Amino acid sequence: MTGPSPVDRARTGSKHHLLTDSSGIPLAISLTGGHRNDVTQLLPLVDGVGPVRGKAGRPRQRADRVLADRGYDHDKYRRELWKRGVKPVIARRSTEHGSGLGRERWVVERTFAHLHNLRRLRTRYERDDSLHLAFMLLGCAVVCQRRLMAP
C-alpha cells in the first residue's frame, strides 16, 4: 500500500478505525493503510451502523453525535454529518490539547486498548488485509462478549 506522494510511502503498516457506542461496544471497524488520511473513513464508519436501539420506542436510525479526534477534522465531513442528522463533536486541529473532548473519547481509547490486549492485533503479522480484518472482527466479538458478560 503506497500513496501518490513519495512522502506517503514511508508510512508502513495499517490503521484501525473504530466506531463504538457510549459504553464501548464496537459498532463498526475499518482498516486502512498507514499512509491514508483518517478522515476518509469517517463517513463509511457512520454509514456502516444500522438502526441503534436504545430507550423504549422506535429505534434511532443513526447516532445522535459522533466524537472524534483531530485526525477527522475537516469542514466538508462536518457538513456531511450535519446533513445526516448527526452532530459532529470533533476536535479542531488549531485548538490546544485539553479542550475537554478526552472526557468522552476515553471510551473509544479503552476499546482500542482492549483490542490491542489481544496479542494478534497488537502487532500485525498478516500480509493479507482481509485476514487482518477478520482477526479485528474476531477481536471485536471478544470485546463485546467480555463487555456483555461483565458483572
Q: Where do the language-model regions lie?
A:
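Basic, amphipathic alpha-helical segments enriched in Lys/Arg and hydrophobic/aromatic residues
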Residues: 79, 83-85, 98-151
